[in-house]
């Protein structure tokens, strides 16, 4: 079992740890200290050793900040976590809606002048620039991490074994990737900090970050077609000669010294480069991580692997959903749901890990967007409630992510209308043909129109990028108000509109989709059009759909989708599960 259900943090831990941190502030002569949920690699996910925000405050979400001052402290979270933070964080910390209120806004009011400490490995160049520009009277002071000074049982750095990703799944040899990217550099070299960028570039995988098959390390891509990899050699013993003569291995402790010795411009990505790295360079030049776009645009082998992973995952999901429908309401718990679903994925004999902690939210817990069930929060799945299940798997050929909201018993009229409006938004994105050059922010409103018509909305983005046996959240592509990167063929994204009634229920429907070139139409004047290929093939709960709210085109799309689900999966199912699927996919 990959997922566990123990409490990893508690509101009670925050006040004494905050008091200890304030003693460190006094010793260091500081007025405050920044605690981001970040590590030295500046990715979204962190190893247990680096989860300082959770250790200090009790908040376990995947994004957030704490600003600890001598008299005040605040935790900043986005819309996904505003219900969760209330339950996890003590009253000693103010709860701030971010980014509506930025760190600079709050600090400017709470600390107009003073010295604000930060760990230069945990703050990116871009973040530092933003804060220093908006807080001219606050001195940002780099210091050794003050949380580490009081975290006496801090876990050791992860040492997961590194292994090669087979060429038939990667689709391109790492030597060719290196040559292709190096040839485009305008600087002498580029620093790469993101673990998934390094893993993609070198066709390696690891296990240093839970649920993410990536190793910790740093890399420098040189314009002459070489890579210097900074990683503990003990983790690489299983690689053999995979890296070849284009990759030089160096100890992590050599990283900053080697950077300082490079003569000429060195490219850094200000969004992911720590201040400590930038300050080691003589002549830094800012540009995007050179791996981001190539990694996002999957090649034919990666797409084929992803399709295979989704078919395998869909069979596990359907077996789970068929089982779920047989369970009497009130006899089932959220934890039992997670255990059964993971068991079905494990039964494929291909599961390497789950791609994130399964969200199993019954009734009001479904309104906690990134809810993680524990032994303390576990509740029964009762008659008349909605059950929101958001889950995914890491397979060697692909990464999956799917959400289905299921009616337990007979749903109410309000829930049915809200679900159907969410479905209309998901269908609108799925059916879309659009001119090449549009970004995610141009598409995001289509997922919301049906909700807006009823005065409803959701706070999170509509879609995030997804890796190929890499991180389930991958940039730079996203379907959101902030999604400014044009979508390109080969990009994989989620399509997951939702609606959440705090204290009552949550609704989300999620498929993964891949951007592809659309066939030319007769009379087409746009040079190139794109469309989405659906990757996820699992039925959508018909009991929650009001057909009267669907247009003819929407009904046709849904019936075609369910026909495809039925035809793809039925040959691989036993008779009873096949009959359940046939009923679940019947025409609306």
Model-derived features: where do they sit?
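Active-site neighborhoods and metal-handling regions in enzymes and metal-associated proteins
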Residues: 1-588
């Amino acid at each position: 079992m990959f997922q566990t259900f123990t409490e990893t943090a508690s509101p009670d831990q925050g006040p004494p740890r905050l008091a200890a941190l304030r003693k460190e502030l006094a010793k260091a002569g500081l007025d405050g200290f920044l605690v981001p949920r970040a590590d030295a690699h500046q990715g979204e996910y962190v190893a247990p050793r680096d989860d300082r925000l959770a250790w200090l405050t009790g908040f376990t979400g995947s994004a957030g900040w704490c600003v600890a001052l001598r008299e005040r402290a605040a935790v900043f979270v986005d819309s996904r976590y505003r219900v969760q933070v209330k339950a996890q964080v003590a009253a000693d910390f103010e709860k701030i809606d971010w980014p509506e209120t930025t760190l600079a806004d709050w600090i400017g009011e709470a600390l107009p002048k003073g010295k604000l400490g930060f760990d230069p490995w945990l703050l990116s160049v871009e973040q530092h620039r933003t804060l220093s520009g908006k807080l001219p009277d606050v001195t940002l002071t780099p210091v050794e991490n003050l949380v580490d000074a009081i975290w006496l049982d801090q876990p050791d750095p992860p040492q997961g074994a590194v292994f090669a990703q087979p060429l038939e799944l990667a689709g391109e040899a790492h030597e060719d990737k290196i040559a292709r990217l190096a040839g485009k550099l305008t600087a002498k070299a580029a620093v790469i900090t993101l673990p998934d960028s390094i893993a993609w570039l070198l066709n390696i995988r690891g296990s240093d970050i839970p649920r993410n098959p990536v190793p910790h390390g740093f890399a420098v891509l040189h314009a002459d077609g070489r890579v210097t990899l900074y990683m503990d050699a003990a983790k690489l013993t299983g690689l053999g000669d995979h890296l070849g003569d284009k990759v030089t291995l160096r100890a992590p402790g050599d990283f900053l010294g080697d950077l300082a010795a490079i003569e000429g411009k060195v490219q850094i990505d200000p969004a992911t480069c720590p201040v400590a790295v930038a300050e080691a360079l003589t002549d830094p030049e800012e540009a995007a991580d050179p791996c981001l776009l190539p990694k996002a645009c999957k090649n034919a082998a990666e797409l084929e692997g992803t399709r295979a992973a989704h078919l395998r995952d869909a069979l596990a999901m359907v077996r789970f959903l068929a089982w779920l429908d047989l369970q009497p309401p009130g006899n089932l718990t959220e934890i039992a749901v997670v255990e059964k679903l993971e068991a079905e994925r494990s039964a494929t004999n291909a599961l390497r890990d789950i791609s994130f902690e399964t969200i199993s939210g019954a009734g009001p817990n479904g309104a906690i967007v990134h809810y993680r069930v524990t032994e303390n929060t576990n509740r029964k799945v009762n008659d008349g409630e909605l059950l929101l299940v958001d889950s995914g798997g890491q397979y060697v050929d692909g990464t999956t992510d799917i959400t289905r909201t299921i009616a337990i018993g007979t749903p109410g009229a309000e829930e049915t209308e809200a679900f159907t409006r969410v479905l209309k938004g998901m269908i609108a994105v799925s059916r879309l043909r659009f001119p090449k050059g549009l970004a995610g922010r141009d598409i995001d409103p289509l997922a919301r129109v049906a909700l807006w018509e009823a005065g409803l909305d959701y706070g999170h983005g509509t879609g995030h990028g997804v890796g190929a046996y890499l991180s389930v959240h991958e940039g730079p592509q996203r379907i959101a108000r902030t999604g400014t990167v044009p979508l390109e063929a080969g990009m994989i994204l989620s399509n997951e509109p939702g609606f959440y009634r705090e204290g009552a229920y949550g609704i989300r429907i999620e498929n993964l989709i891949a951007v592809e070139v659309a066939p030319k139409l007769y009379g087409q004047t746009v040079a190139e059009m794109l469309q989405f290929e659906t990757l996820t093939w699992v039925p959508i709960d018909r009991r929650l759909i009001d057909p009267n709210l669907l247009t003819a085109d929407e009904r046709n799309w849904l019936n075609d989708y369910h026909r495809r689900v039925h035809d793809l999966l039925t040959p691989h199912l036993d008779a009873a599960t096949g009959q359940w699927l046939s009923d679940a996919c019947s025409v609306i």
